[in-house]
Every structure is written in C-alpha cells, then in structure tokens.
UniProtKB/Swiss-Prot annotation:
Family of this protein: Belongs to the plant acyltransferase family. Phenolic glucoside malonyltransferase subfamily.
PANTHER family: PTHR31625
UniProt comment concerning the protein's domains: The HXXXXD motif is essential for acyltransferase activity.
UniProt name for this protein: Phenolic glucoside malonyltransferase 1
Enzyme class of the recorded protein, top EC level: transferase
Designated gene of the protein: mat1
Active site: H165, D394
Task performed by this protein: Malonyltransferase with broad substrate specificity acting on phenolic glucosides including xenobiotic naphthols. Has activity against flavonoid 7-O-glucosides, flavonoid 3-O-glucosides and naphthol glucosides, and to a lesser extent against coumarin glucosides in vitro. Prefers malonyl-CoA as an acyl donor, but also active with succinyl-CoA and methylmalonyl-CoA, but not with acetyl-CoA.
Any single Pfam family the record assigns to this protein: Transferase
Native source organism of the sequence: Nicotiana tabacum (Common tobacco)
Binding annotation for malonyl-CoA: K254, H266, T268, S269
C-alpha cells in the first residue's frame, strides 16, 4: 500500500502560453476508446522521509512546472463534444494543471524491481488514476496525465505515469519524461534541453488528401457507447514477469532463421524477439488445460512510428500520435509446430517490410482496417519499443533500476512490453502479464529454447 504525503496540482511555470488548442488527427482518433497507459520507473535512492519531503518533492514540482511550459497539452484536457457533432481536441487554458501525488510505502522495494513473477495488483498502488472528467458548455473535459511519486524509505523512489493515449504516443510521452528528468537533474537550467525534447505542435503537417480523418472519426462514433472518459481500473488476477534476451542470443536466433530461410529480407532483433515470444506464448497455452483449436487463427500486432514515412518526414519531435498498425496472422498449429518460430519471423517481418516505407498506404487509411478481423482474445500485441529509452531518464539519481509497463495487464488478449535492457547495449527486456500457471509454462519454454541455441 501507499499512504499519501501530499496531493497537489502542478501548473506550467510563469511565462507559459495562456492557451493552446490542438485538433485531433486521424492518428489520435483511434485511441479515444483505448485503455489508459501506465508506466512506473523505479530508482534506487536510499533517502529518508525528511529528505524526500524537504528536497525531492520541491525540486520535482519545480522542474515539472518548467517542463509543462513546453508540454502544455499534458496539463490540459481532451475536449469531446457531448453530442459527438464535431471532432475532439486537446485544449489547454491558463489554470489547467497536472495532478501529482507524493506518497510513501513500506512494500519491499527489491521485490517490486525483481524479474521473477510478482502479483500484478501490487503495482497499482504506485500509478495514479486520472481525475474524473468534467462537463463544460457543449463538451466533456477529461485530463490526459497524472503522476505519482512514491518513497520507499532508505531504498528508493518510484515515479508512476498514467496518460490518455489520445494525447500522444510512446515517442511523445518518453520525450516528456526525459525532458522532465533533464530539467530536474540540472536544476531547471533550460540550456540542457536539447531540440529533440522541444515539441513540434503544427498539426497541418499531417496530410489527409483522401479524407481519412472523417472516415475514421465516423467509424469511431459507432463505438461511442464503449468510450469511457472516466479512468476505471480493475487490477487483474495475474503475475508480472520480466525476461532478458541478450544480443548474443538474438544473433543466434537470426542465424537460425536465415539458415532455414536464407532469402528472408526482414530478419531483425525486433522480429526474432517478438516471434520467439509469440511461439512460446502459443505453446504455453497447453499448461492452462483449456481446449485448443489447432485450426483457430492467432494474431500478432504491433504499432510502429511512421513519422519518417511521410514525404517530407514529420519532425521527430512531432507531439501527438503517429503510429500505424501491422498485423500478422496464422493458424495455431503453424506456430505450435517445429517450424513455428521460423514461420512467425517470416510473417511478422513480411507484415512490416511491405508497408514500412509506404506513404500511400498510410494516407489511404488502410492501416486502420488491419484490426477489423483480429480476435483480440487470440492476439499478442507489443507495448513500447527498444527505440524509446526510458532507462535514459536520469532525474539526478542515476538511471532507473526497473521499468514496468503496468498497462499490459489488460484482459482482452496478451500484451508484451519491449524495451532496451538497462544493463547492456543490444540486450532487450521483455515484460509479460499472465496467469501464474501460464507464466510458469512460458518461463520454462523461454529458458529451455534459449539454452539450446
């Protein structure tokens, strides 16, 4: 559990713009009904409560306020028309703020940062819920970001983030976190804030010659009864586990695939890692005792940053969502067999390869239809990316000891988190949330398979 020390609202620092409104693009609309994103960073820092209250809390509030001067929409709200007659938008006005909770916990810090299976419910004490939406003339206003900082006396600190995906994708949120970390580490000296952390807000760079925005918005309105502006969370009865796949093992997996399929052209660290996890997940299902349909379809889905796929490319610091989805699918029996891993690599690689530089495909909106025939309960999806390095977020206390993607706990299917390893360049860190039985079976297969490479 966590007891509250202080709950406050942090506003952007003086000198910030008085208002900012960003229309949602078709890249944003698709996330309106999506569950909230939750991440926790754990830092080893052996400090006492008095030090936490007297030094850590004031500096974090000051640096967050300064960071929000650059990231105004995160202090604002998503404004959704109550009659659904117009597009939603991100809206900031003077006085808007981010809810921040400072708390203290006596839970075992070393247990939480472990790699072994841990109860998923334990982590929800350290991520905040977004405040309830409020009615305003003609619209409903829902906050898009909340933060919780928790002290584990004489052991460490965690920083939990909850955000509405409609505000921005992983690239946007990670840049915000790293900007905050830099300003906190260097005492608010803005000269340390490199251009890559200064958001680009011009939404006119998102081209829409085919009216994709209207098409997707009309499609999303069909599901408005499913869109909950409230942040409702029920922690599932699962365990969380973390697995490391080394650069050396990734190289062996690539060689294994290319020995069997020498003509494959998109064999990357991402494709072999995801394919290996996918096949281990499929094979672990037998341990649950549930009936398995060998001819049933299995799905793999991932979202990729498409900023560089436009002509001209969007700025890397573009604020918002710029993701397109890739889907691979095949029968259960194909993945469970001896050639399952190779088949998975080929399917995932081909799904990405044929679309990775296809601006026309993006502008046609076809990527939105990729998920139409996906059975969510038979799917594995990916959260995070090795390209987004939250382990680089140093608030002045050193690199994080552990990163947890709490939002992979959803019950619709199985999600895996994927990030750089904190300890070694080229190694990847995989997070999973499964039933205890399934996790044990997965861990055995994951370890056994790697040992025979």
């Amino acid at each position: 559990m966590a007891s509250v020390i202080e709950q406050c609202q942090v506003v952007p620092s003086p000198g910030s713009a008085t208002e900012l409104t960003l229309p949602l693009t078709y890249f944003d609309h698709v996330w309106l009904a999506f569950h909230r994103m939750r991440r926790i960073l754990f830092y080893k820092l052996p400090i006492s409560r008095p030090d936490f209250v007297q030094t850590i809390i004031p500096t974090l509030k000051d640096s967050l306020s300064l960071t929000l001067k650059y990231y105004l929409p995160l202090a604002g709200n998503v404004a959704c028309p109550q009659d659904w007659s117009g597009y939603p938008e991100l809206r900031y006005v003077t006085g808007n703020s981010v809810s921040v909770i400072f708390s203290e916990s006596d839970m075992d810090f070393n247990y939480l940062i472990g790699y072994h299976p841990r109860n998923t419910k334990d982590f929800y004490h350290f991520v905040p819920q977004l405040a309830e939406p409020k009615d305003a003339p003609g619209v409903q206003l829902a906050p898009v970001l909340a933060i919780q900082v928790t002290l584990f006396p004489n052991h460490g600190i965690s920083i939990g983030f909850t955000n509405h995906h409609v505000a921005g994708d992983g690239a946007t949120i990670v840049k915000f976190v790293r900007a905050w970390a830099l300003l906190n580490k260097f005492g608010g000296d803005e000269q340390f804030l490199a251009n890559e952390f200064i958001p680009f807000y011009d939404r006119s760079v998102i081209k829409d010659p085919n009216g994709v925005g209207m098409s997707i918005w009309n499609e999303m309105k069909k599901y408005k009864h499913m869109m909950k502006m409230s942040d409702v969370v029920t922690p599932p009865d699962k365990v969380r586990g973390t697995f490391i796949i080394t650069r050396h093992d990734i190289g062996k997996l690539k060689n294994l695939v290319l020995t069997r399929r020498p003509k494959l052209t998109h064999v990357t660290s991402f494709t072999v890692t995801c394919a290996y996890v996918w096949t281990c997940i499929i094979k672990s299902e037998a341990a649950t005792g549930e009936e398995i349909d060998e001819n049933g379809m299995e799905f793999f889905g991932c979202a990729a940053d498409c900023r560089a796929q436009f002509n001209p490319p969007l700025p890397p610091s573009y604020f918002g969502n710029a993701l397109v989805g890739y889907v691979a699918r095949t029968r259960q029996v194909d993945l469970a067999g001896k050639e399952g891993f190779t088949i998975a690599v080929e399917l995932i690689g081909e799904a990405i390869r044929k679309r990775m530089k296809d601006e026309e495909w993006i502008l046609s909106g076809s990527w939105f239809k990729e998920y139409d025939k996906v059975d969510a309960k038979r799917s594995l999806s990916v959260a995070g990316s090795p390209k987004l390095d939250l382990y680089a977020a140093d608030f002045g206390w050193g690199r994080p000891e552990k990163l947890e993607f709490v939002s992979i706990d959803n019950d619709d299917g199985i999600s895996m988190s994927l990030s750089k390893s904190k300890d070694s360049d080229g190694d990847l860190e995989i997070g999973l949330s499964l039933s205890k039985t399934r996790m044990n079976a997965f861990a055995a297969m994951f370890t056994h398979g790697i040992s025979f490479l």
